[in-house]
C-alpha cells in the first residue's frame, strides 16, 4: 500500500520502511515473537472488519482508492491506501490465469505427503467486481508480520495478501473451470 499523508508517513519518513513501520506503530505484544510488535490480522469491510485493532477497508469512489482505515475514539483515519489503477494492474498481473489447488496432507515419519483433491482454473479477473467484493466483505486483506519495537527494523514480513472467499471466487473471474483429479 501507499502511506503518503498518513500517520505511518509521519512516523517513518523512509518509504521503503513503511510496511515495517505500520507493524511497529499498530502492532501488539505476542508470545510468539517476544520483544517485537506483531501484526497478524485480517482486514475486511467496515461492516465485517474481522480484527480487534479497529482496522477496516473502505472503497473511496471519488478518490478512486481503497483505504485501510482505523477506527479509534469514534473517529476514523486513513492509515494506508491503494489507487484503483495500481490495484487493477497488480490483479491482472498476478492472476491472468490461476490454478487453485486443494490438498490433504499427512506426515509419514519425517516426510510430508500430499494428496491433491481439487483443482480450479480461473481466468480474467474482473476489477470492478473485486471492488464490489471488498465493499461486501468478501475480499479481505491480511497483514502478516512482526518487527522490532525501536531502532533498526528487524523481524519478518510474511507478505501481506488479498483474499477472496472460495465460494465467491467464480464471481471475481470471468472464467472458472473445475479440473477433475484422478
Where are these regions (language model features)?
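Nucleic-acid endonuclease domains
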Residues: 1, 7-182
